[in-house]
């Protein structure tokens, strides 16, 4: 595979941006074995945004010859009071439900689950003096203003009442990039600010400097699209506002969970926000794109329509679908039906796993989320 093909894999949907593509090209040209990482807080059930969107890029990176790493951020989750702030529960969920679910999704998407390294945050930090020196070093090169700017909208609005833990979080994220030797830190577009901080301190830190062939480099940040919540009632006004309106583990009707049954998927999609002719921030269109149009189709997607409205449509590409929807030739109800069936087909192996070998994991997660 040549360098341009590898770059195309990294840029492939659902990628939203790479900072920068030219630096990525230089990394590939070096011939150096590159490391990736994506980090996750440990909280509730895994939905299609966390699972399929994120892991689809992990699979792309595997194919591009990059060593992929999934960071299970137990300490970060504890700082953010996830799962009731119970660190033991957070760790248990991380190394069981999260690892096994991600592995299954990687397999379903055509990747190799065994080729991805899963790292628990507390294991990275344990007896690791250099990590803590790195963290302190990073704080020496960041201002309070920079850290505040990297917070979520909610965090920035809290003013003087913000918990100190929230301000510790961004430097921890930055430290993780370097401690994991991640040439390509990866996350949703909502992680952009933290990755920019990592790039800003890359040439200043003394510990864990990121190098390729002895030359110090900045990490190349990869950001994928966020899926809008199913239950939004209007379009977000900006990319940042979308990060506050994305699918949420804590709001079941906002998301398709990877273990949802076919009937649950149909019911959620039927109620989803899907304005006619509107293709921007349309969660139903985005779900159909990730489930049916990530790879070049070998057969057309059939969108069933009543005969009086022209009968069934055969669609070969997402661009064709988007144009048809914008022109009003595909009705929201027909789009929702097609999306539901595509999602059911994609997630069927995952659903079957949680009905069989993974049933105990799912039951344990249900019990944990109820008691938290």
From Swiss-Prot:
Catalytic activity entry: tRNA(Tyr) + L-tyrosine + ATP = L-tyrosyl-tRNA(Tyr) + AMP + diphosphate + H(+)
Residues annotated to bind ATP: 249
'KMSKS' region, short sequence motif: residues: 246-250
Keyword Cytoplasm found: yes
Span of the signal peptide: none
Keywords: Aminoacyl-tRNA synthetase, ATP-binding, Cytoplasm, Ligase, Nucleotide-binding, Protein biosynthesis
Keyword Nucleotide-binding applies: yes
Highest taxon in the source lineage: Archaea
Function statement: Catalyzes the attachment of tyrosine to tRNA(Tyr) in a two-step reaction: tyrosine is first activated by ATP to form Tyr-AMP and then transferred to the acceptor end of tRNA(Tyr).
Family membership noted in the UniProt record: Belongs to the class-I aminoacyl-tRNA synthetase family. TyrS type 4 subfamily.
Designated name of the protein: Tyrosine--tRNA ligase
Organism expressing this protein natively: Pyrobaculum islandicum (strain DSM 4184 / JCM 9189 / GEO3)
């Amino acid at each position: 595979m040549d360098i341009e093909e590898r770059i195309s894999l990294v840029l492939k949907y659902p990628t939203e941006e790479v900072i920068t593509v030219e630096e990525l090209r230089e990394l590939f040209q070096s011939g150096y074995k590159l490391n990736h990482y994506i980090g996750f807080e440990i909280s509730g059930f895994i939905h299609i945004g966390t699972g399929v969107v994120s892991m689809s890029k992990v699979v792309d990176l595997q194919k591009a010859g990059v060593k992929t790493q999934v960071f299970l951020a137990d300490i970060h989750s504890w700082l953010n009071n996830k799962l009731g702030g119970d660190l033991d529960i957070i760790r248990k969920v991380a190394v069981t439900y999260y690892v096994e679910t991600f592995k299954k999704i990687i397999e379903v998407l055509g990747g190799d689950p065994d080729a991805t390294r899963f790292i628990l945050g507390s294991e990275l930090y344990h007896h690791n003096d250099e990590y803590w020196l790195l963290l302190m070093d990073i704080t020496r090169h960041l201002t309070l203003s920079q850290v505040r700017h990297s917070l979520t909208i909610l965090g920035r609005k809290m003013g003087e009442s913000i918990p100190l833990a929230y301000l510790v979080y961004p430097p921890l994220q930055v430290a993780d990039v370097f401690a994991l030797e991640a040439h390509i830190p990866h996350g949703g577009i909502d992680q952009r600010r933290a990755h920019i901080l990592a790039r800003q301190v890359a040439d200043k830190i003394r510990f864990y400097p990121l190098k390729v062939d002895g030359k110090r480099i900045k990490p190349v940040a990869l950001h994928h699209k966020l899926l809008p919540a199913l239950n939004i009632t209007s379009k977000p006004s900006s990319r940042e506002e979308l990060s506050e309106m994305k699918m949420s583990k804590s709001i079941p009707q906002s998301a398709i969970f990877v273990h949802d049954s076919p009937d649950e998927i149909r019911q959620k999609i039927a109620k989803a926000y899907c304005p006619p002719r509107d293709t921007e921030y349309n969660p139903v269109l985005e779900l159909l794109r990730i489930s049916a149009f990530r790879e070049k189709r070998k057969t057309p997607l059939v969108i069933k329509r009543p005969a009086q409205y022209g009968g069934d449509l055969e669609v070969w590409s997402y661009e064709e679908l988007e144009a048809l929807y914008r022109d009003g030739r595909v009705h929201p109800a027909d789009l929702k039906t097609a999306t539901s069936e595509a999602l059911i087909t994609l997630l069927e192996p995952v659903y079957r796993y949680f009905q069989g070998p993974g049933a105990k994991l799912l039951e344990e997660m249900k019990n944990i989320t109820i008691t938290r």
